[in-house]
Design a protein with these regions (language model features):
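Alpha-helical membrane-targeting segments
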Residues: 3-19, 130-146, 464-488
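HKD-type phospholipase D/PLD-like phosphodiesterase module
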Residues: 10-49, 63-291, 328-399, 415-417, ...
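Short catalytic-loop micro-motif centered on adjacent basic/acidic residues
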Residues: 55-57, 294-299, 378
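A cross-family glycoside hydrolase active-site/sugar-binding cleft signature
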Residues: 57-59, 89-91, 298, 324-326
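Hydrophobic/aromatic residues located in beta-strands of well-ordered beta-sheets
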Residues: 86-88, 321-323, 405
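Long, C-terminal catalytic modules of enzymes
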Residues: 165, 356-488
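Terminal interaction modules at protein C-ends
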Residues: 193, 220, 224-250, 255, ...
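Short, solvent-exposed amphipathic alpha-helical segments in soluble enzyme
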Residues: 311-315, 422
């Protein structure tokens, strides 16, 4: 089966499961951004030229210099262009937590902007998971442990950046993530704008305190959205418009002159309200991988549920399955204090346990003629940097570039599937330049793999080396990873 056939067969598989957005990759200016400074520059530039709408959602907005520059850019755009409207949505717990460095929170930083421009120009919303709502009144960190609004999407007019990166100083400087930019995509930008609006409406709206020096940072005017209404609103967003897709060319497309070369399928996952759309679409993606194809997975926090491990094991059984995750020296929780200092050890423990689990799942695929290929786990280690990238790259074989990629906020872990709210997009493309750009993404990430701690689960010598590299993992980590694994 050639690349075009894989494109069409995968399209047929995905079309009944998610809303499809066809486009021409070159005309839409769809491209990956490769590093934090480029992400920051692109976002600030888009905001500075906004003419109608700015809709941003993330876990939180930091309070450092680069974040203040971003806020100043929003302020200036609102001041010089009366038609611009801004909508911001953040996690209810994380946005209230004060920075240990600056002593202020996301809400504190944005309140002056809200006072200046008013709620008609700028609307600020907090979205909390049901478990976190029950923890209201307790320290914000406890609400974050229970579950967070983890989606990241940045819409400016008809531009869109989908990413796993928050709006924070380190994500603009030296925390490597993944970022896909669409420079001209009115339909997909509309979809994400509507998603952000829906999530904001299901959360709380921040209002201006009646007293300038009120001890309360904010008040709210929106009631808690019942779970059934929340789920209904999100399901209406992802529902396919056309579920009887045959050939690729039969999907609706505004330019009848030439068929689209790329399709985007956005997904939403919110386990706490029973919204498993992303899980369903990911299952279909992995089912579409040819037996001699390749699956490459990146995640900052490696903690996949057993059913996802089984799906990975069954995908491309005689091809490549590779995972790229954080080395302990570039881990996001490196340097944490107290009980949180065990988080890195827990992830190292989970990684070690994953290898035999994957090997066992693959053993059932063995035959007399073919032996399944092993799993390769690489550790990203870069001095002075932390690692936060996530995504999937699918190839039909090792000889052709990636034809499908998944990008967004999910870490493909137990927490992503069961506790947090996530959004991703599946990009299915036949456009050569975009496919090679996806390959370059993976190449840039994998150049920082630390060979001393990377291994194949079928390679005993390398596996022993990886086990020795985790010898500093504290004994308590195994117990903690079992007890709190669902929260990691």
């Amino acid at each position: 089966m050639n690349a075009s056939s894989h494109f069409c067969s995968t399209l047929r598989r995905l079309a009944p499961l998610a809303r499809a957005f066809p486009l021409h990759a070159k005309e839409a200016r769809l491209r990956p951004l490769f590093d934090p400074p480029e992400f920051h520059r692109t976002l600030v530039a888009a905001i500075s030229r906004a003419k109608g709408r700015i809709s941003l959602c993330a876990l939180y907005l930091g309070t450092g210099d680069l974040e203040k520059e971003l806020v100043a850019c929003i302020d200036k755009t609102l001041s010089v262009r009366p038609a611009v409207r801004v909508r911001l949505v953040f996690d209810g717990s994380r946005a209230r937590r004060k920075s240990r460095i600056s002593g202020i929170s996301t809400l504190s930083l944005l309140l002056p902007l809200l006072r200046k421009h008013g709620p008609d120009r700028l609307s600020l919303h907090l979205c909390s998971m049901p478990a976190a709502q029950k923890a209201e009144g307790l320290p914000p960190m406890l609400g974050e442990i229970a579950g967070v609004f983890h989606a990241k999407a940045y819409v400016v007019d008809n531009e869109l950046i989908i990413s796993g990166a928050n709006l924070s100083d380190e994500y603009f400087r030296n925390r490597q993530d993944r970022y896909l930019h669409i420079g001209k995509g009115p339909e997909i930008a509309d979809w994400y704008h509507n998603m952000i609006k829906t999530l904001g409406d299901c959360g709380k709206t921040v209002t201006i305190p009646s007293q300038i020096n009120s001890k309360f940072e904010f008040t709210t005017k929106s009631p808690k959205c019942p779970v059934r209404e929340w789920r209904k609103a999100l399901e209406s967003l992802v529902k396919p418009v056309n579920t009887t897709i045959g050939l690729a060319e039969s999907l609706p497309f505004p330019d009848e002159g030439k068929p689209p070369d790329t399709y985007i399928f956005p997904t939403i996952q919110c386990g706490p309200i029973g919204m498993d759309h992303d899980t369903t679409v990911l299952d279909a993606v992995l089912d579409s991988v040819p037996v001699h194809g390749s699956v490459r997975l990146a995640t900052a926090y490696l903690n996949p549920p057993s059913r996802f491990v089984e799906k990975l094991a069954a995908a491309a059984p005689y091809g490549e399955v590779s995972i790229l995750t954080a080395h302990r020296d570039s881990h996001g929780f490196r340097g944490a204090k107290g009980l949180m200092s065990y988080v890195v050890d827990c992830y190292m423990r989970i990684e070690s346990d994953l290898r035999p689990l994957f090997r066992s799942a693959r053993t059932t695929l063995s035959s007399k003629d073919l032996v399944p290929c092993p799993l390769y786990i690489g550790a990203y280690r870069r001095p002075g940097w932390t690692y936060h990238a996530k995504g999937l790259w699918i190839r039909a074989s090792h000889k052709v570039p990636c034809f499908l990629s998944v990008a967004g906020s999910s870490n493909f872990g137990r927490r992503s599937f069961d506790r947090d709210l996530e959004t991703q997009m599946v990009i299915l493309s036949n456009e050569p330049n975009l496919r090679y750009a996806f390959e370059e993404e993976w190449s840039r990430l994998s150049r920082f793999i630390n060979d001393s701690t990377s291994s194949s689960c079928n390679d005993t010598a390398t596996l022993d080396s990886a086990t020795r590299s985790n010898k500093n993992t504290r004994p308590l980590a195994r117990l903690l990873s079992v007890i709190f694994g669902g929260f990691l």
